[in-house]
Structure formats: structure tokens, C-alpha cells
Amino acid sequence: MRNEITGGSPSLSRAWFALAVLALAAILGITDRQMLTLAVEPLKRDLQLSDTSLGAIVGFGPILFGALASPLLGWLTDRVDRRWLLVACVLVWSAGTALCGLVTQGWMLFLCTLTLAVGEAGLGPVVYSMLPDLFPPALRTAANTIFFAVALFGAGLGIAGAGAIFSVAAPLAHALSIEPWRLAFLLVAIPGPVVAGLFALVGHPPRGGTADQHERAQETLAHYWRRSGAMLACLIVGYAMAAFYVGAILGWAPVSLIRDFHVDVARSGLYSGIAVGGGSALGLLASVVAVRCLRARWGRLLPVVIGCAMALLAALLLLMLSFATSTAMLLACMIGIIAAYIAGAALTPTLLQDIAPPHLRGRVVGTSSLVTYAFQAMSVPSVGAISDALDGAPYALLKGIVWLGVPAAVFSVILLGLVLRTFRTRFEPHCEVGAQAL
């Protein structure tokens, strides 16, 4: 199923259909995950959990478990029919979401969130391994950008949709004599089997790649790591540090709206959705403008340059979050931080695809996911622990985000700065990243 560039090609039509279903799966996964964030307060009340326990159950545990599962799922991605692997992942995380609505103990919720996390961990390796084989080189970066953009805007839609589901569930739950959050989890799990069925219709493309990648077709993972590992490690950890402070924002800012600014659950979901969607749009636009204006100057270094600059901007915005005493100011800082992160991360998928041979692509993406998940896993419970230690102090959650987020952003700047210094001699990608993108 090698693609041609003709728009009327049946294989290309199937590729666009596959991209649409992959994007839909990403939106569904985000919605399921954000449902946990918006349900924090009723879960805390009904299951009698502390912020630290909630951080471990909703954040640390599932994210860490997903991180550990990512390399295995990346290995499977490189060896099995990626179509059926994704179908299995969607069904697994949908089952975990539905079971969250049936729990009565904290440990039961923990097991359900682990199930959800394992299913979602397979999405990244499958998508970023499959897109280069679905689309010809001339359309690959465009396909990556479209999926990245849809997933970004889907994050806003996901959290807003989760809030809307809570609103719909409330009157129905009253009629059924159950807690609204339980019904909300059951409702949000319904689309999962439908999306899985749609993707089952997609054919499995043969694994391909560029001429340079074919020359390295027999390269082992160990040899690849010896050749490119040092700078790859700096790059992955640098972006993971950015994911750390963004994870803290996404995990606790909606809760802070409810707890510190007395916003109800539905409006918290709506406001947070607007902030995530608006920040995503601004970040993607900033990335497009930067590519068009700076590509000639920086060439293949551009993704790292943008990432370094945006991490520095995020550090300044996190400092401003210390002074947020109104809903509007919190949302403004949230929009800016998310925009800075997105602008830096927009070209990362294409960069990883360019530096990885086709037969190792799933494992490279899986390794990147493992590191990113690990840092995200630490962000949510760490902020929760600071909140508990402050014992009811005003804006305790925001203080935790700032105290941990600023050092993370600074460390991201340092690591990406190291990449800039040695990129040309120790970490050579095989095409100009961003030259065709956007």
C-alpha cells in the first residue's frame, strides 16, 4: 500500500481516512483522561482520599505504568499489525474508563486508571510509526502537522466535552439514584468500541522509509543508541521537562479553579477547555510563523531552537502564575504556558521520525513516551504533596505548580541548549526538519 501523490489514489484516500480515525482516537483518549481531572473533587469526597493519594491514583501511578508499558508497546508496534494493536488499545482504555464509574475504594480506582493508562500508551508509537508509511514523503510532514493540530485542539474539546458530559449526567444520575461522576464515566466510555471498529477497516501499510533509512535497515537498537544516544537523551529529557510543568498545569489548574476561585465543575471544564484550545492554537500559530521566518537561518536546528526559547518563556510565565489572584489571570497564564509548550513541541514528531530507522521507529517513540510519562507521573503527585504540606493555605496548588515548574523549565532550557552546541557533530538527522512542515 505505498502511496502516490495523486489525490485520487485509493491508497491515499485510505491514508486520509486512517488519519481521521487516528485523530478521533486521540480526542477520545484525551476526553477519557480529562474526565479523571474533573472528577477529582467528587472522588476525593466519596472515596475519602487526600490530595497526595489522588495525585498518586490519577497522576503518578497510571502515568508511570503507561511509561513502563510504552517500550513494550513500541516493540509490538515494530513487529505486529499496527491496526489491530490500536484496536486493542482503544478497547482496553475504554473498559478502564467505564470501570472507573463502578469503583467503591481507592485501590479499585487505581487499578482502573492503570488499565486506562496502558491502553492510551499504545497510541503514540502506533500513530508516529504508521503515518510515515501511510503517506508519501511529500505529504508526511503535513500529515504529522494535521494530527498534531487535531490532537491539540482535541485537548480543548476533550476537557470541555468532559465538563459537558458531567452536566448531562447530573439530571440523569438523579433520576437513576447514582452519583453523577459514576454515570459520566460510563457515558464517556461508549464511543470507544465505535472508534475501534472504524480503525479495523483501515489496511495495514508496509513498513517503508527513505533511502538513507533503508541503508540502515539492519541496524540494531543498541548500535543506534551508541551512534545517536547522547544527544537523543538530551533532546528527549529536555522535552520531558517541559511536559512536567505542563502536566502540573493540566492536572491541577482546573482543580484550582474549583477550589480557590469557587468555579463549579462544569464551568471549570469549559474554562479549562478554552484555555487549552486557545493556548494550543496560539502555540501552533507561533510554530508556523517561526518556521517560515527562521528556517533559512537555523535549518535542521530550528526545532531545538524553538523548544529552547519557548521553555525560557514558560519559566517567566510560571513565575507570573505566582501572582494569579483571579480566574482571568490564572487562565491567561495557563494559555501562555500551554502556547509556549506547543510551539516548542510541534515539530518533535517529525524530528523523531527523521532520526529513527523504520524498523526502530516504534521503539524510539516508545522510549520518548516512557521518559515523558515518567516526568508527567512525578508532576501531579508532587504538586499534590506540596498542597497537603501547606495544609489549606490560599492558592496552595498554584504555589506547588510554580515551585516545581520553574526549575523544570530552566532545566529544559539547559538541556536543549546543550543539544544546540553539539547537534551538528553528534546528532545528525537525515533531512531538514521543518523544511517541508507547516
Put a short name on every predicted segment.
Residues E4-L12, H204-C234, D260:
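Juxtamembrane intracellular "pre-TM" segments in multi-pass secondary transporters
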Residues L36-T37, S228-L284, A345, P349, ...:
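Extracytoplasmic gate region of multi-pass secondary transporters
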Residues A39-L68:
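Extracellular/periplasmic helix-loop-helix junction of adjacent transmembrane segments
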Residues I57-L73, I274-S287:
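Central cavity-lining transmembrane alpha-helices of secondary-active solute carriers
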Residues A67-G106:
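Conserved MFS/SLC helix-loop-helix module at the cytosolic interface between two early adjacent transmembrane helices
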Residues L91-T104, A311-T325:
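C-terminal ends and interior cores of transmembrane alpha-helices
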Residues C112-A151:
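Cytoplasmic helix-loop-helix junction between adjacent transmembrane helices
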Residues F147-L201:
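Helix-loop-helix hairpin linking two adjacent transmembrane segments in secondary transporters
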